[in-house]
Curated annotation (Swiss-Prot):
SUPFAM superfamilies: Glutamine synthetase/guanido kinase (SSF55931)
Protein name per UniProt: Putative glutamate--cysteine ligase 2
Catalytic activity: L-cysteine + L-glutamate + ATP = gamma-L-glutamyl-L-cysteine + ADP + phosphate + H(+)
An example molecular function term from Gene Ontology annotations: ATP binding
Family that this chain belongs to: Belongs to the glutamate--cysteine ligase type 2 family. YbdK subfamily.
Chain segments annotated as coiled-coil in the UniProt record: none
Species annotation: Bradyrhizobium sp. (strain BTAi1 / ATCC BAA-1182)
Amino acid sequence: MDPRILERLRLGLSDDERRLVIRSATGGEDVTEYSFGIEEEYFLADARTLDVAIRTPDDLFEAANWSTGGQAMREMLQAQIEVATNVHVDSRDAREELKFLRREVASVAGQYGLTILACSTHPTAMWRSSQPTPRPRYAEMMEDLRIVGQRNMLCGMHVHVQLPDSERRFAVMRAMIPYIPVFIALSASSPFWNSRETGLKGYRLAAYDELPRTGLPELFTSKPEYDRYVAALTRSGVMPDESHVWWAMRPSLRHPTLELRAPDVCTSVDDAVAVASLYRALARHLYLHPDLADAVGNVERAIAVENKWRAQRYGTDCLFVAEEGPVTGQEILNRMIADIAPHAEALDCLAEVERCRTIMQFGSSADYQLQAYRESGGELSAVLRWIEVATVSRSDPPRTHAPVEPAQ
C-alpha cells in the first residue's frame, strides 16, 4: 500500500472519526440484550462516469480498513465493499456511525478515482463483466455456484440483534417470518438491472434467490432441529459451515444474534436506521412473547412467501395477502407499530420506528430512483447521480411525492 495514503489517513482524521473511534473503543465489550449492529454493502463506481468498478486494488481496501478502524472489507465481487458498525444500544449512535463509515469509505475510494453507491443493484452494471475477489474462500464459492455466483452483483443490508437465549432465538425467527416482507418493501432499492427497468421495486432478491439456501427460513421449532439440518449439509460436503445458510433471516454462527438479511441496502442512512430499529423493537416483542411462534405454521409461511414476492414487485405500494383479504403496507405497518411501540420506547428508538411510516407513505429508494428516471426522460445517468448524492448526503432527501409505479 502507498505509504503516502497511510500517512494522510493518520494525519487527516475528521472530527467525526476521532469522536467515533473513541466512543466505539469499548462498544464490542458493553453488550446488552437487544443491542444491535448493521452491515451494509456498497458498489464501487468510477467517480466520473459512475460505471461500476470491475477490478479494484487491494490497497483501496487496506486504506478503507485503516480509515474506519477495521470496519471495511472486501466482498465476494471486486465491485463491492462492505462496512460493519460497532455494537450499539442507541439508534442515534448507529446513525452517526453509518454516516461516518460511508463518508470515510467514499473519501478513501476517491483517492483511487472511485466513489460508493448505496443501492442493491447498480442500474447499469452488466453481471457478465463481474470479477470475483481473488481469495481462496471466494474461489471455492465461485467453483460451486458458477454462473449463479457471477450473477450475484448485488448489495444488501444485514441487521444483527442480540437475543441471548438460543431456543428463544429460534422462536423469534419462526414468529418473524410473516413480517419479513414488510422489511423488503421498506428497503427496496433495486428497480434496475443490466441497464433495464425491471418492473420490480426490489429486484435484488429475485436474482439472489437463484442461490441455494435462500428465501424465507424453514419452520424449525428448536435449535436441535436446525443443528440436525446444518449437520446433514456439512457432513455431506454441501457447505463448510452454517454461514453458507443464506436465508432472509438466520441465527448467527459467531454471535448470540438473529440476523435479518432480507433488506436491500437503503440509500438513505436515516431509512437504514429506521428499518433496523423496527426490526430491533419487533425482535424484543417476539422474544418476550415466545408463544407467538406457535401461530406461525405452514399456511402462514406460504402466505409470507407470496407477500415476499409482492413486496419485491410493488415495494411500498404493495397490497399484502391476509386471510381476511388484501391489506395495504401502511395498514400492516400500523399494526406492527401498535404492537411494538412499548418496546421501541423501552429501547429509545420510537422516533426511528415512526420514520417507517414516512417511508411507507412516500416511498423507498426505488421510488426516488424511478422518479429520477422519469423526470430525466429515461436517463440512467440521472438515477446514478441521485444515488451518489443520497448515499453520502448529510441531510435526508426530500419526501415530496407519492411512490412511483414501475413499468408494467
